[in-house]
Amino acid sequence: MAAAVASGIAPTTAMVDQVIPNQPTVAAAAPPPFPAVSQVAAVAAAAAAAEALQTHPNSSLYVGDLDPSVNESHLLDLFNQVAPVHNLRVCRDLTHRSLGYAYVNFANPEDASRAMESLNYAPIRDRPIRIMLSNRDPSTRLSGKGNVFIKNLDASIDNKALYETFSSFGTILSCKVAMDVVGRSKGYGFVQFEKEETAQAAIDKLNGMLLNDKQVFVGHFVRRQDRARSESGAVPSFTNVYVKNLPKEITDDELKKTFGKYGDISSAVVMKDQSGNSRSFGFVNFVSPEAAAVAVEKMNGISLGEDVLYVGRAQKKSDREEELRRKFEQERISRFEKLQGSNLYLKNLDDSVNDEKLKEMFSEYGNVTSCKVMMNSQGLSRGFGFVAYSNPEEALLAMKEMNGKMIGRKPLYVALAQRKEERQAHLQSLFTQIRSPGTMSPVPSPMSGFHHHPPGGPMSGPHHPMFIGHNGQGLVPSQPMGYGYQVQFMPGMRPGAGPPNFMMPFPLQRQTQPGPRVGFRRGANNMQQQFQQQQMLQQNASRFMGGAGNRRNGMEASAPQGIIPLPLNASANSHNAPQRSHKPTPLTISKLASDLALASPDKHPRMLGDHLYPLVEQQEPANAAKVTGMLLEMDQAEILHLLESPEALKAKVSEALDVLRRSADPAAVSSVDDQFALSSSE
């Protein structure tokens, strides 16, 4: 069951919902008559209030069950009739709507006791209020000590009648009958006594007796987690049994007689519709949990007449839904673990591929147990699907042979299927390792003269542009702080015989005469000084990445004072260097796929990065290098798909930025949130 009813605070609606019993039970047969409990006189109520005052000297009262229209002035007028009110407050939500309860503070505990004695259950706006001493100690409210659960209450039993019935046994800290949204009794309630002994005395005296001609059950309050089956597999403690598929002609007495051989029964009922006809299910409430467990074990699945009974623990709808969710999740995990290593994820599928064609393509590599191309609501392919094999070996063979294969007009991407949580965890772990200072040692590159230094090293800098000289001699590229992708992944290195002669602008004195290309100085201090102007680098980086443009005498007309850009190609003059377009066309993508197939694997990142970086820079200029490095960690076929599909690229860039925001400290990633907001709104 749920947490115990608050001792000083009345059970809220949420709390009441948590402690709803398994199923309401109805008395099947009236036991020997029991004298109805007489209503407690005002003297008894006064004595209980005085005893509470001696034990809990408190001048603050909790006032519950208020009509939503009741405000402070209504309560002030009422309580001032008994004693001067020090202050009061009606509790409200953020929209200033009443929560249905209030706190009233008096100058001394005697006034509070007198107000509780005189005004408890007094009507305001035709609704009786419920007054208790306020107790802010959570250990007392939530302990469940002295808490009694009463069910099978008659609809005429309200809070006042329940209080008067149980107050003769001792001091009551909290008393409430559960109500529905229209104010009708749900047939059960709670009473919390100050002492455990008085609670036990009330249980011994009233359990099984008649209240308004209905036999009631009175027992200790049991938390929901104690009723449900524990994770260790212990037998759940329950007494209420649900019986389904009952014959139409069976009566309450016959149902009780059928189950009575397994233990004492407090009530048994067959549920009926408005016409009085059986609904073919009912409930049997045993006195002991052991008898209920035996009845479930013995009676479930047996035949009664022409029907096979279902007998199980009675559950609320929320409990059944939770159990079904838990069972479904376990089955899903079990099914996924069974297919672990045998289930393939396919991406970049051609629109012409359907389930039959997909199975035909992959059947040559093994026994395909299932395959599916995912469709949208219009029945069109979403471009991805799944293929499951009977064993992991067949799946690995199919992945090896089919990954990157041209199907229709698209290169197919094939990988082992992963759950979303696993993919996100892998990406997070990968980026964390990349950013870890311990993994920032120099990374060897197939291109001579290129080294990757950790951040904070002699050649580190705050920006991503790199310096590449002729034959790469003695040059070290600058890397962004805390980011460790390999140098050959950087864009700007076009496919060809060797790396381009490329240099980002840096402050120098403008030359007055055309002369030879400006050389590089190898000193680390000079190189660091060249990176001090971030704005200057960002203004000119795109020009040098995108093409040489129109230049004269090795100098660009639009370059700021003191900035001398160099040609991108050592074999061509700067004034006639062709303008390059970085937006790949379908023909370029097809040709790139062919070039990749002919090139050695160590050249693939360089070739892909040359095409990918400009597209990423258009969407995320501030962190283009970081995002490009992350995207280049993906499979080659998927990168080709990103080059071809702007929507897919934008989604991946957003995903990479999300990882950056979660993993990088604010100093490591510049304006990630602002840039991401801009790119998402475009």
Swiss-Prot record:
Keyword Signal in annotation: no
Gene3D superfamilies named among the record's database cross-references: 3.30.70.330, c-terminal domain of poly(a) binding protein
Cellular component terms (Gene Ontology): cytosol; mitochondrion; nucleus
Gene Ontology MF annotations: poly(A) binding
CDD domains xrefs: RRM2_I_PABPs, RRM3_I_PABPs, RRM4_I_PABPs
InterPro entries xref list: Nucleotide-bd_a/b_plait_sf, PABP-dom, PABP_1234, PABP_HYD_C, RBD_domain_sf, RRM2_I_PABPs, RRM_dom, RRM_dom_euk
One GO term of the biological process aspect: nuclear-transcribed mRNA poly(A) tail shortening
Modified residues (Phosphoserine): S600
Residues of the RRM domain: 59-136, 146-223, 239-316, 342-419
Annotated keywords: Cytoplasm, Nucleus, Phosphoprotein, Repeat, RNA-binding, Translation regulation
Subcellular location: Cytoplasm; Nucleus
Tissue expression notes: Expressed predominantly in immature flowers but also at lower levels in mature flowers and siliques. Detected in tapetum, pollen, ovules and developing seeds. Also detected in primary inflorescences and immature siliques.
Main location, first listed in the record: cytoplasm
Domain PABC residue range list: 588-665
Family: Belongs to the polyadenylate-binding protein type-1 family.
Functional summary from the UniProt entry: Binds the poly(A) tail of mRNA. Appears to be an important mediator of the multiple roles of the poly(A) tail in mRNA biogenesis, stability and translation.
Additional observations: A.thaliana contains 8 PABP genes.
Protein name per Swiss-Prot or TrEMBL: Polyadenylate-binding protein 5
Protein species of origin: Arabidopsis thaliana (Mouse-ear cress)
